């Protein structure tokens, strides 16, 4: 985590694409630092769509808060994430996770797995209003990561999900 955070903090962002299915501006890129490159997601605050139930311009902060909470409590579910300036202004930058393409998502997420129970608890604590199967990222080392935490930490109970069918 420390090495990834150093890379995210001190690297130079090169935007190489955009995730077109995202509701907010979500840019894919490379973070160049000390001769190496790391794939990243960059979500500039300027690209956030207003939501009726969340204050404008706070989604990136909530993404960062989810990482800090996950990291500091040992959940280890959220990829390394920081807030920093980028080509489109201040935003959230997160290490990209390569998903294990061999994992059959429907089968994986219908099983009673310790990491899914941990994620369900994590979502309840951070009051996640938007957990979907596409936000879960099982990597090639068997570790489960989760992304897209912009609508969390609301002051009202808003836990919503379409994932926890089991």
Predicted features, each with a name:
Residues 3-108, 112-129, 133-134, 140-147, ...:
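Conserved ATP-binding subdomain of kinase catalytic cores across diverse folds
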Residues 144-166:
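C-lobe/activation-segment region of protein kinase-like
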């Amino acid at each position: 985590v420390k090495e990834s955070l150093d890379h995210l903090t001190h690297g130079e962002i090169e935007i190489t694409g955009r995730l077109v299915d995202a509701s907010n501006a979500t840019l894919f890129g490379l973070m160049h630092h000390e001769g190496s490159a790391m794939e990243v997601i960059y979500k500039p605050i300027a690209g956030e769509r207003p939501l009726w139930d969340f204050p404008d311009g706070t989604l990136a902060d909530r993404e960062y808060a989810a990482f800090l909470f996950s990291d500091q409590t040992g959940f280890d579910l959220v990829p390394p994430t920081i807030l920093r300036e980028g080509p489109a202004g201040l935003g959230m930058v997160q290490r990209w996770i390569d998903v294990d393409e061999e994992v059959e998502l429907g089968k994986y997420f219908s099983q009673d797995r310790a990491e899914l129970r941990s994620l369900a608890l994590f979502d309840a604590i951070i009051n996640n209003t938007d957990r979907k199967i596409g936000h879960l990222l099982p990597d090639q080392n068997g570790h489960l990561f989760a992304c897209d935490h912009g609508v969390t930490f609301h002051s009202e109970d808003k836990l919503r999900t379409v994932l926890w069918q089991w």
